[in-house]
């Protein structure tokens, strides 16, 4: 977990990030938290554009720091019209730099995704159903286990098939992905699933389809890196923000999707606060509540509605109109609460945000990261947010400016 945020108004955008990095140690589950991670980068020394990283700290085993600073050295002098063009340039760089991230490392990343998915799915099914009411015969039990796995992946495939392709992927990539999966997945499956030397064809078919979709289509694996591109292209007079999630690389293409809910176009009327990773405290500040409160309220109203309906039925009242009214009432309650919070919290914060100076923008961004860190400090959870906070301001006039920046060395000893 981490706490990162962008605060944007017509003048500039402020980026703030903590330094915490959480590592879990293999089978032991030991959790180590380090407070020295770099998450904000200057993408060009000549133009007003920055990049922020969250979740995984590497691209197919290559640290983002190496990839980003190599891009800046080779392409930082190139100016682009929009932030989207900077994003495309960076992705092209990732696709072409096999001397930094080799084909072997890219394929190893895909195999890691396969292995984690298989292990997670099998462990989950094992706890729920695999060892319930199995026959005594080993062969019969194995057949039932394989059938249940095949049914599970068939259901997952129905869902994944409806998902959109990763950006830049299409049906032609499915053919190549299927061939790659056939050549690489089988041994991984044999290492994880119980078997007698092979897997039945119907299970193989579902696994092939599953991993083909994982390579080509948007999915919910947590093995991604979030990249946030922020700043100004040469044709943009107001800050633009584009957030993507990168899952790996296949067939000379980066597997990524755009997170539209965490993007902001270049617009003078578009002042926003966008949190990443640890979001609850920011939402509470902006909206007056976080999502868990609304979910709890919705569940509570639904439960009370069901109890009222049950009481009516027990008294011999079976009125479909009453049931529809209760459902409508629940939606109306949620809508009124959200409208109240929007009018009394969100709009006030947004209106205030529009008039903030660069200095106040940076202070606000830093304070919101501090708020998340403090909440974890006084809770019984791991302090997965913390350490020094880096803060940068990007404006059209002044470019990328560091407000606060941690250094791993003594600046007085390194004047060169």
Model regions: which residues?
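N-terminal nucleophile
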Residues: 1-416
């Amino acid at each position: 977990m981490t706490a990162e945020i962008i605060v944007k108004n017509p003048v500039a955008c402020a980026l703030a990030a903590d330094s915490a990095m959480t590592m879990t140690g293999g089978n032991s589950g030991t959790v180590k938290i380090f407070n020295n991670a770099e998450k904000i980068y200057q993408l060009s020394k000549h133009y007003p554009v920055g990049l922020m990283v969250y979740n995984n700290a590497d691209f197919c085993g290559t640290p983002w720091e190496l990839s980003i600073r190599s891009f800046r050295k080779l392409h930082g002098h190139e100016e682009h019209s929009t932030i989207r063009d900077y994003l495309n340039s960076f992705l092209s760089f990732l696709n072409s730099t096999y001397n930094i991230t080799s084909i072997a490392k890219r394929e190893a990343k895909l195999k890691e995704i396969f292995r984690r998915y298989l292990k997670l799915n099998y462990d989950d099914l094992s706890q729920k159903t695999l060892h319930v009411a199995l026959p005594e015969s080993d062969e019969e039990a194995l057949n039932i286990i394989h059938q249940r796995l095949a049914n599970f992946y068939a259901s997952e495939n129905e869902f994944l098939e409806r998902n959109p392709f990763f950006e830049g992927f299409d049906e032609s990539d499915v053919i190549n992905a299927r061939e790659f999966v056939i050549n690489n997945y089988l041994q991984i499956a044999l290492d994880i699933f119980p078997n007698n030397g092979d897997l039945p064809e119907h299970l193989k078919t579902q696994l092939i389809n599953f991993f083909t979709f994982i390579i080509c289509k948007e999915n919910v694996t947590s093995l991604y890196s979030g990249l946030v591109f922020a700043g100004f292209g040469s044709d943009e007079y107001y800050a633009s923000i584009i957030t993507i999630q990168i899952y790996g690389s296949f067939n000379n293409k980066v597997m990524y999707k755009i997170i539209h809910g965490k993007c902001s176009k270049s617009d003078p009327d578009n002042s926003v606060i966008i949190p990443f990773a640890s979001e609850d405290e920011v939402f509470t500040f902006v909206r007056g509540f976080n999502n868990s409160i609304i979910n709890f309220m919705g569940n509570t109203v639904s439960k009370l509605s069901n109890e009222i309906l049950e009481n009516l039925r027990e008294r011999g009242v079976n009125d479909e109109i009453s049931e529809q009214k209760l459902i409508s009432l629940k939606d109306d309650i949620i809508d009124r609460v959200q409208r109240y919070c929007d009018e009394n919290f969100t709009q006030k914060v947004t209106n205030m945000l529009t008039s903030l100076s660069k200095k106040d923008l940076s202070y606000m961004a830093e304070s919101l990261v501090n708020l998340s860190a403090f909440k974890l400090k006084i809770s019984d959870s791991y302090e997965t947010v913390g350490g020094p906070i880096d803060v940068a301001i990007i404006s059209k006039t002044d470019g990328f400016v560091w407000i606060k920046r941690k250094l791993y060395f003594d600046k007085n000893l390194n004047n060169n």
